[in-house]
């Protein structure tokens, strides 16, 4: 804490996190998501597992032709029913290419193939099984990361692909005349090389377009939080790779479900630290949190009504005119033995500031005190303004960011009185009790529900870190795909 995942899933890890990327833009993001090389390495491991399964589905065509034996003439051969038994991808790597995207490289891959063969020369028929190994396979693919400005979704395409094969070896079984294969071995090896190099890139390209891109489209760019607000996590620019990272600039902004309008302030530029030891990072600007305050305050959702039955029974403080009459005599005189009610609301949007030393919140609340008359109607007593300085403790739970407010300082001001003049200092001790013991626990209960982090599906986070910086909170984590 600070003061402050099936085929498509695994393959998607090659790029889903890679899509956490940034671009030069005139609009600062509310959130910057970053994947480090450590994260890319893990994503590559997971993605290659799925690519391996897809490559093992390659269908190999039958090969047939003629051969010639000296003094005996021509014969026919056929290689058929060939099935891939295993596709080994031992050395794989994915790296960011500055201003381009991602470079996927696989080296020293190999294939084990089993099939049948037959040969015929007049009345002589030969045949059997064969095992074939393809070794020294290399695959190079470029992945282009972009975005759809209209929807804010990230996009991915295979911009280039090439593959090569060093060696093809055939082992024949089932006939003592298997040496005949040597007559057309080179022809078979050449045909197989051409077929496999083409099909490998077809699989890579089709996997990107048929699995990755649709998967990307399922990632929500907006999240509805409640009846009042949602969060916009859309991209504000195409993904961009740098030498060591991939960044993604997200709008990172709360918005009103009833009437969306831009906040009257802009996000600051975020200066990410260069040292990273986690797979992914989220730089969450104070702008993100302040748009939350702006939306909820404008919607009139930041309010609370306090009655005496909400006060702990063991408390000496009571919301009655009798108790308040001790502090303000005219309350008891004008409204003897009555219940009271406090209506508290935010008169201004709360303002959060982030610094390396921690997170601070300025909250201005108005409190209207009422006497509850025998007919249950309300009679106004006085109106207070409360200026609160609060510390914000931020943490993470699962895929959500949670928070807690702690009171540092509270100043009272009497804005209006319906019962005549009185010293506001007489209420300071009461408000000092009400705020941390009754009001803040209600707010903190809601804050413990948290805000959803902009993460793809099936991702579990661990080794979490949270560190405040100037204008933003840096959230770091390692990733596991379930």
From Swiss-Prot:
Give expression by tissue: Restricted to cells of the myeloid series.
User: How would you summarize the oligomeric state and partners of this protein?
Assistant: Monomer. Homodimer; disulfide-linked.
Glycosylation is annotated at: 62, 303, 375, 389, 463
Q: What cystine linkages occur within this chain?
A: 161-201
For this protein, the record's PANTHER family field holds: BACTERICIDAL PERMEABILITY-INCREASING BPI PROTEIN-RELATED (PTHR10504), BACTERICIDAL PERMEABILITY-INCREASING PROTEIN (PTHR10504:SF84)
What are the top taxonomic ranks of the organism? Eukaryota, Metazoa, Chordata, Craniata, Vertebrata
Question: Where on the tree of life does the source sit, at the highest rank?
Answer: Eukaryota
Q: Chief subcellular site? A: secreted
Q: Report the locations given in the UniProt record.
A: Secreted; Cytoplasmic granule membrane
Naming one, the record's GO cellular component terms include:
membrane
Record's comment describing the protein's domains: The N-terminal region may be exposed to the interior of the granule, whereas the C-terminal portion may be embedded in the membrane. During phagocytosis and degranulation, proteases may be released and activated and cleave BPI at the junction of the N- and C-terminal portions of the molecule, providing controlled release of the N-terminal antibacterial fragment when bacteria are ingested. The N- and C-terminal barrels adopt an identical fold despite having only 13% of conserved residues.
Which residues does the annotated region (Central sheet, part 1) include?
27-36
Q: Which Gene3D superfamilies match?
A: Bactericidal permeability-increasing protein, domain 1, Bactericidal permeability-increasing protein, domain 2
Q: Where is this region: C-terminal barrel?
A: 286-456
Q: Does the keyword Electron transport apply?
A: no
**Cleavage sites for elastase: region residues:** 235-240
Endpoints of the signal sequence: 1-26
One GO MF term on file is: lipopolysaccharide binding
Which keywords has UniProt assigned to this entry? Answer: Antibiotic, Antimicrobial, Disulfide bond, Glycoprotein, Immunity, Innate immunity, Membrane, Secreted, Signal
Q: Which Pfam families match?
A: LBP_BPI_CETP (PF01273), LBP_BPI_CETP_C (PF02886)
Q: What is known about what this protein does?
A: The cytotoxic action of BPI is limited to many species of Gram-negative bacteria; this specificity may be explained by a strong affinity of the very basic N-terminal half for the negatively charged lipopolysaccharides that are unique to the Gram-negative bacterial outer envelope.
What is one Gene Ontology biological process annotated in the Swiss-Prot or TrEMBL record? defense response to Gram-negative bacterium
Renumbered to this chain, region (N-terminal barrel) spans: 36-219
Q: What is this protein called?
A: Bactericidal permeability-increasing protein
Indicate the family of this protein: Belongs to the BPI/LBP/Plunc superfamily. BPI/LBP family.
């Amino acid at each position: 804490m600070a003061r402050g995942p099936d085929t498509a899933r695994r393959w998607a890890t090659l790029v889903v996190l890679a899509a956490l990327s940034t671009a030069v833009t005139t609009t600062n993001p509310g959130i910057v998501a970053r994947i480090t090389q450590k994260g890319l390495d893990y994503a590559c491991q997971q993605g290659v597992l799925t690519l391996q399964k897809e490559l093992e589905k390659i269908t190999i065509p039958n090969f047939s032709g003629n051969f010639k034996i000296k003094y005996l003439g021509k014969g026919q051969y056929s290689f058929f029913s060939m099935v891939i038994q295993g596709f080994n991808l031992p050395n794989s790597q994915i790296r960011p290419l500055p201003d381009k995207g991602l470079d996927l490289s696989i080296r020293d891959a190999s294939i084990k193939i089993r099939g049948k063969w037959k040969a015929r020369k007049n009345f002589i028929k030969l045949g059997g099984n064969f095992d074939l190994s393809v070794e020294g396979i290399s695959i190079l693919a470029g992945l282009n990361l972009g975005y759809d400005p209209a929807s804010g979704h990230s996009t991915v395409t295979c911009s280039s692909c090439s593959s090569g094969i060093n060696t093809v070896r055939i082992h024949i079984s089932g006939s003592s005349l298997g040496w005949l294969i040597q007559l057309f071995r080179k022809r078979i090896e050449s045909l197989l090389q051409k077929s496999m190099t083409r099909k490998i890139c077809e699989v890579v390209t089709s996997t990107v377009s048929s699995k990755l891109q649709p998967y990307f489209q399922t990632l929500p760019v907006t999240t509805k939080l409640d009846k009042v607000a949602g969060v916009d996590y859309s991209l504000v620019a195409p993904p961009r790779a740098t030498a060591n990272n991939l960044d993604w600039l997200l709008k990172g902004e709360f918005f009103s479900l009833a009437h969306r309008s831009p906040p009257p302030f802009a996000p600051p530029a975020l200066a990410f630290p260069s040292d990273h030891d986690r797979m992914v990072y989220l730089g969450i600007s104070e702008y993100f949190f302040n748009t939350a305050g702006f939306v909820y305050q404008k919607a009139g959702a930041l309010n609370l009504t306090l009655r005496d039955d909400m006060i702990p029974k063991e408390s000496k403080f009571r919301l009655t005119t009798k108790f308040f009459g001790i502090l303000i005599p005219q309350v008891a005189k004008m409204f003897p033995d009555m219940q009271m009610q406090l209506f508290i609301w935010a008169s201004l949007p709360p303002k959060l500031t982030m610094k390396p030393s921690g997170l601070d919140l300025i909250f201005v609340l108005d409190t209207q005190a009422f006497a509850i008359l025998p007919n249950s109607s309300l009679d106004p007593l006085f109106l207070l303004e409360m200026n609160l300085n609060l510390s914000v403790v931020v943490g993470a739970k699962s895929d959500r960011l949670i928070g807690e407010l702690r009171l540092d300082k509270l100043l009272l001001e009497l804005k209006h009185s319906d019962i005549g003049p009185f010293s506001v200092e007489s209420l300071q001790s009461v408000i000092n009790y009400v705020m941390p013991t009754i009001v803040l626990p209600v707010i903190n209960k809601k804050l413990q529900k948290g805000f959803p982090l902009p993460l793809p599906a099936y991702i579990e986070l661990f080794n979490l870190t949270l560190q405040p910086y100037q204008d933003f909170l840096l959230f770091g984590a390692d990733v596991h795909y379930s």
